[in-house]
Amino acid sequence: MFKKIVKSIAAIKTENDRDECYWQIDRAFEEERISYEDHELLYGLAGMVEVA
């Protein structure tokens, strides 16, 4: 799951893409598929991606 989300983050081109990534991250955490630490790390990475 972690790798799938990282790939989604790498593909961010718009704010909608970023929102979709945030949703995926939250859902994976709620389903206990990623840890809290991974949740925070992925949120940080998604927030760093610049969009046009």
Feature map (PLM): residue ranges:
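Short, charge-rich amphipathic alpha-helical segments embedded
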Residues: 28, 33-38
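Short, charged early-sequence alpha-helical segments and their helix-coil boundaries
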Residues: 36-52
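N-terminal acidic leader/helix
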Residues: 1-30, 43, 50
